[in-house]
UniProtKB/Swiss-Prot annotation:
Oligomer status and interactors: Component of the small ribosomal subunit (SSU). Mature yeast ribosomes consist of a small (40S) and a large (60S) subunit. The 40S small subunit contains 1 molecule of ribosomal RNA (18S rRNA) and 33 different proteins (encoded by 57 genes). The large 60S subunit contains 3 rRNA molecules (25S, 5.8S and 5S rRNA) and 46 different proteins (encoded by 81 genes).
Entry protein name: Small ribosomal subunit protein eS17A
GO MF: structural constituent of ribosome
NCBIfam families: PRK01151.1
């Protein structure tokens, strides 16, 4: 079983990341020295725990957004994703020979919105193909 991290360690690490994200790295030793310079931490053991959890969170941030932590770069990235507009519209009739191929649900949605689009309804099976071979 792993060790339990206290609320103090988690709060301190999140605060460090939100304020000093550009200075932090994926290296524990570097983060430990940075914790020493930035914060006044009572004990060496607590400093090491905070630096370790900070390093752990930095590795998670590299993979994707982490719940409870927001910093400027992450906010900008989220904003860009929200403002994304595809180059080619899914409703562009010139690319699909004047008819859109949709399933039953999408067809109902288009009708409820009151859009007058030429639709071709395609039956979609409820089950997807298995990605892997079934174990015997």
């Amino acid at each position: 079983m792993g060790r339990v991290r206290t609320k103090t360690v988690k709060r301190a690490s999140k605060a460090l990341i939100e304020r000093y994200y550009p200075k932090l790295t994926l290296d524990f030793q570097t983060n430990k020295r940075l914790c020493d310079e930035i914060a006044t931490i009572q004990s060496k053991r607590l400093r090491n725990k905070i630096a370790g959890y900070t390093t752990h969170l930095m590795k998670r941030i590299q993979k994707g957004p982490v719940r409870g932590i927001s910093f400027k770069l992450q906010e900008e990235e989220r904003e860009r994703k929200d403002q994304y507009v595809p180059e080619v519209s899914a409703l562009d009739l010139s690319r699909s020979n004047g008819v859109l191929n949709v399933d039953n649900q999408t067809s109902d949605l288009v009708k409820s919105l009151g859009l007058k689009l030429p639709l071709s309804v395609i039956n979609v099976s409820a089950q997807r193909d298995r990605r892997y071979r079934k174990r015997v």
